[in-house]
Curated annotation (Swiss-Prot):
It is found in: Cell membrane. Part of the ABC transporter complex MetNIQ involved in methionine import. Responsible for energy coupling to the transport system. It comes from Oceanobacillus iheyensis (strain DSM 14371 / CIP 107618 / JCM 11309 / KCTC 3954 / HTE831). Keywords: Amino-acid transport, ATP-binding, Cell membrane, Membrane, Nucleotide-binding, Translocase, Transport. It is a peripheral membrane protein. It comes from the Bacteria. Its main location: membrane. This is Methionine import ATP-binding protein MetN 1. The complex is composed of two ATP-binding proteins (MetN), two transmembrane proteins (MetI) and a solute-binding protein (MetQ). GO terms for cellular component: plasma membrane. The keyword Translocase applies. It catalyses: L-methionine(out) + ATP + H2O = L-methionine(in) + ADP + phosphate + H(+); D-methionine(out) + ATP + H2O = D-methionine(in) + ADP + phosphate + H(+).
């Protein structure tokens, strides 16, 4: 649905050139929810704005639904943008207009008649769950309700793509979850492709099928969300994931441990209890699981357990080798010499 080919965006000044996006290529599939995560200044919002040419790339090509947007004239580009909805952190609602008028405004700009505008706007407010707020003004709404109006407005012209620029960063955790749930519902009901820009890995974990990690204008890692979480390659990616999957043991508990500490990661359908039980039966070691947690990413389990193992060093070494064969990801956190 969206193909970016070697996108670069430069900002020139008298003193220096700033590179906002640096040779980024992405292929975002039709109907998926794609996340782009990075810290402030990573270039993710600039990249998102290149997707609908609100920012014109310095180099590269942008295809949306097979159309090269950079080859269009201004009139053609305005027409093409009707198939690309966009929501922002700041909502940008017209304070002097009611909720239904804010949604209708996008339809009016597209030349839709008044009766049809009103009907469509009410349908969209029903879709996003605030049909009862139709005649209220933005000042009477909560932050989550305002974002729902923004989503309804962005969907007014039946777009094929919805771009979300930090759409939940101004919301509290509970409201964020409700907005993400709404976006997922919309994706499932109408099959719209959604691209989400965020600095929160929790957002990516919650709804994204695939994701990319940006740093200094570059995409440093990308792939299926589950694979990124279960086997990250880059340090920045690992740092982001630790904000969601924090399995660190308290220092006081670490000091009480006399054996070798292992961090075991279980993916998919591998049963942690079975693997650990088999290991203890086949090796002359004692084991004690100190901490464990299972997260579900796109309905697939990802488990991490901290285990203390004690016994003869050679048996411990053999037990670790056995675990590595069964579950692949085994990390020795603390090794005790006997």
């Amino acid at each position: 649905m969206i193909q970016l080919e070697n996108i670069e965006k430069h900002y020139e000044s008298k003193k220096r050139r700033v590179i906002g996006v640096d040779q980024v290529s992405l292929d975002i599939k039709k109907g998926e929810i794609y996340g782009i995560v990075g810290y402030s200044g990573a270039g993710k919002s600039t990249l998102l704005r290149c997707m609908n040419v609100l920012e014109r790339p310095t180099k590269g090509r942008v295809f949306v639904d097979g159309i090269d947007l950079l080859e269009l004239n201004n009139k053609q580009l305005r027409k093409a943008r009707q198939s690309i909805g966009m929501i922002f952190q700041g909502f940008y609602l017209v304070s002097s207009k009611t909720v239904v008028e804010n949604v209708s405004f996008a339809l009016k700009a597209a030349g839709v008649g008044k009766l049809e505008r009103n009907k469509r706007a009410l349908e969209l407010l029903n879709l996003v769950g605030i049909e009862d707020k139709a005649n209220q003004y933005p000042s009477q709404l909560s932050g989550g309700q305002k974002q729902r109006v923004s989503i309804a407005r962005a969907l007014a012209n039946n777009p094929k793509v919805l771009l979300c620029d930090e759409a939940t960063s101004a919301l509290d955790p509970s409201t964020t979850k409700s907005i993400l749930k709404l976006l997922k519902k919309i994706n499932e009901q109408i099959g719209i492709t959604i691209v989400i820009i965020t600095h929160e890995m929790e957002v990516v974990k919650e709804i994204c099928d695939r994701c990319a990690v940006m740093q200094n204008g570059k995409v440093i890692e990308n792939g299926k969300t589950y694979d990124i979480f279960s086997d990250p390659n880059e340090k920045l990616t690992k740092d982001f994931i630790h904000t969601v999957l924090d399995f660190q043991l308290p220092e006081a508990l670490l000091k009480q441990c006399n054996g070798t500490l292992l961090k075991l990661q279980f993916r998919g359908d591998i049963a942690a209890e079975s693997v650990v039980s088999d290991m203890l039966q086949q090796h002359k070691v004692k084991g004690n699981i100190l901490h464990g947690k299972v997260e579900y990413i796109k309905d697939k389990p990802l488990g991490v357990f901290i285990m203390e193992v004690s016994g003869d060093p050679s048996e411990i070494s053999s037990a670790i080798s056995y675990l590595e064969e069964r579950i692949k990801q085994v990390e020795v956190i603390q090794h005790v010499s006997y």
